[in-house]
Curated annotation (Swiss-Prot):
This protein's record includes keyword Cytoplasm: no
InterPro entries: AAA+_ATPase (IPR003593), G_ENGA (IPR031166), GTP-bd (IPR006073), GTPase_Der (IPR016484), KH_dom-like (IPR032859), KH_dom-like_a/b (IPR015946), P-loop_NTPase (IPR027417), Small_GTP-bd (IPR005225)
SMART domains in the cross-refs: AAA (SM00382)
Subunit and interaction comment: Associates with the 50S ribosomal subunit.
Organism whose genome encodes this protein: Chloroflexus aggregans (strain MD-66 / DSM 9485)
Function noted in UniProt: GTPase that plays an essential role in the late steps of ribosome biogenesis.
Residue ranges annotated for the KH-like domain, each copy included: 359-444
Gene Ontology MF annotations: ATP hydrolysis activity; GTP binding; ribosome binding
Keywords, in A-Z order: GTP-binding, Nucleotide-binding, Repeat, Ribosome biogenesis
Protein name (Swiss-Prot/TrEMBL): GTPase Der
Alphabetized HAMAP family for the sequence: GTPase_Der
Amino acid sequence: MPKPIVAIVGRPNVGKSTFFNRLIGERRAIVEDIPGTTRDRLYGDTFWNGREFTVVDTAGLLFGDEDPSLPEVEIARRTRVQAEHAIAEADAIIFMVDGRDGLTTADADVADILRTTAKPVVLAVNKCDSQERMLDAVEFYALNLGDPIPMSAFHGLGTGDVLDRLTEYFPPKTFEKDEERHLRVAIVGRPNVGKSSLLNRLLGKERSVVSPIPGTTRDPIDTTITYYGEPITLIDTAGIRRAGKIERGIEKYSVLRTLRAIERCDVAMLLVDATEGVTAQDTHIAGMVIEAKKGLILVVNKWDAITKDSQTYYEFEHRVREAFKFVDYAPIVFISALTGQRVSHLLDYAREIYAQRQKRIPTSELNNFLREVVVQQPPMAVKKGAHLRLYYAVQPQTEPPVFLFFANDSELVHWSYARYLENRLRERYGFQGTPIVIVFRSRERKEER
């Protein structure tokens, strides 16, 4: 079941970023060193009441850093744009207002917009860091958006109440029956790299509106086909375009659409334009796929438009591999969606990666493997004088494959040894196209006897 997307909207300086950082601070610290992601995240995942959801800093996504010194008219316009995009893209909305400032005209204007949607809206009155402020929150009943919830993002007061209300709106958890599970493939990439053309080629018909104007594919489109007797769902998305002027904020907001598609897929086909080469946006999207731990195929499209000699393919492949060296397990396929060149290979790769993601190594075999690789290269502890020992390993999860290694002290494991184990696992068992997760856990002392 896809994670709900929650957008935080409100005027500048009401505390949206403070609340956002409080929600995803730990998560952000974990992923900030992944290639293709940045330290200042605009979105992230968090948990509450047993539910995981994606929270989005809507203002930052649309406009970058907020400037409270902007003219009041411009602040109001930007806040309205946030609300409109949240209504269009999010599953639920947190509307944040400032309890110190009290009710403003801009707040009322946004409330008018939010009341037009059937999507749930939680009214959070921030900066209520005293009993008096909390009592003043009743003023916001006038917005007619339900009970205002007093809170302080800075101190953490009342944030749990906001999240309690939010998760009440989430649909009940559902679990697919085994027979309903089948391969889902997302076609992702920047605008005008040929995503819809590829979808049409795979379908053999015009399913999406295709135009040289970037962004003509507006919303994710799901189509299920049958390939060698097996159903495959293809998800086409609006592309991600480089940051531009405020008026083009809607293009930056397409990040949410790609996030949603990646979250729902098993394998992502990331299209790169051969005529432009690999861009920073391409590697950023690859980082999103890594973070979601989904399978990945690097697809170089428009290969027919490249003038070639005997070395062109090898030189271009080397450049692509260098740019995406942080996903060296992903296959590279050169295609032309226009002519159909090698397009048929893509579904074969996707099916194989899907199978690799479901692969499970028997515990006995995995521990034979562990003994072998430890003998070949014993682990070195990160602390001088300390001795690191790896006892045994299990694979508790698939999709993606997760391997849990028990050690005398997990803090002694150097990152390079985790990389060594991953490389050896791939050499022995494949796992082409899918990330694998290596986890170390300290064994209890009483177990060491």
